[in-house]
Amino acid sequence: PSFISVFSNIFSGTAATGGFLGATVVWAFNRGVNRGLFSNEAGQGSAPIAHAAAKTEEPVSEGMVALLEPFIDTIVICSITGLVLLSSGTWLKKFENKFQQADTVVLSGAYHESDPDGKSAVSEHVLGNKPLPFYTGSLEVRNGQILNTDITLLHARSFADSVRVKEGKEVLFSGTLSVRDGRIELPMNKERAVYLTGKSLLHSAPLSTEAFKKGFLGDWGQFIIPFSLLLFAFSTTIAWSYYGDRAVTYLWGTKYVRIYHVIYIVGFFLASFTDTTIVWTLSGITVALMTLPNLIGILLLHKEVKSSVNEYWRRMKEKL
């Protein structure tokens, strides 16, 4: 069924099913390539830093080993994750969750998911085809409930349902919230931070967590993602620290490595409580900044690479 849904729905426009708004082939392709490049680091020049440290007499053979990494990262791991999401059906369902501020948008005007015209209008807005006006003003909140009736609240590209405004530890908020160009300006009080909860679609790790809970492990399945992320984060932290260490040493010398380490640690601290949408956006920008100069270098050295590969295969054929 998972494979069938991939091919049967690719051009069918079932994007609005279950509240999932604005998902087309172009959008899915864009996100797929984006996440794929982020997962396997293709063309970014990071893996060669690690492979350059390997003790080998043949650089081409080391390159062949490196080719296996994108296959495992993208084709195997990402495909399995996608099939888990499709087979579980969680990608179409709304779950109770804490809204991320960067994923929350307030539209001017009341649009309802039960109304086909309203749903279509919001879907076109999410796609960027026919933008709807963003709301600017104030939201009146009483006992956690937003009293304004002339707005539409979206979260994670879906209609937000059963929205409640809370502060501190699950205390219902009463007061006024400012909204500017569709973005809610939440008070950032350290002891009583204001936030929104409700039902909406999920993405990233929370979506995968819900999907694994639908498997034969039941609620125990939710621990697969945190454990996997722990291992991934630990290995990524070490690897990228080494990559940056080598790059800084090459560009400016060893005396600047300590400064790099401090910036690196501060970056991890800030990212730990930043909305994942912001993190994904920043990662996309930095990936482009890494990839462009590296691809230029590959183009300039393509003759040398081709010559080395041809010589490698010639020697391999002679051995056979």
Language model regions located:
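Transmembrane helix-loop junctions in multi-pass membrane proteins
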Residues: P1-S2, L83-F95, G182-R183, L201-I225, ...
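Selective recognition of specific alpha-helical transmembrane segments in multi-pass small-molecule
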Residues: P1, P59-G89, Y260-F268
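Hydrophobic alpha-helical transmembrane segments of multi-pass small-molecule transporters/permeases
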Residues: A28, G32-G36, L67-P70, Y195, ...
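C-terminal membrane-solvent junction of multi-pass transporters and transport-like membrane proteins
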Residues: F134, S138-I146, D150-L172, L177, ...
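Low-complexity, proline/glycine-enriched hydrophobic segments characteristic of transmembrane helices
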Residues: S88-F216
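A generic transmembrane alpha-helix motif of multi-pass inner-membrane proteins
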Residues: A23, N30, Y256-I259, I263-N310, ...
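Helix-loop junctions at the membrane interface of multi-pass solute transporters
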Residues: G36-E41, S46-P59, V65-P70, L86
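Helix-loop-helix hairpins and the membrane-proximal interhelical loops
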Residues: P1-R31
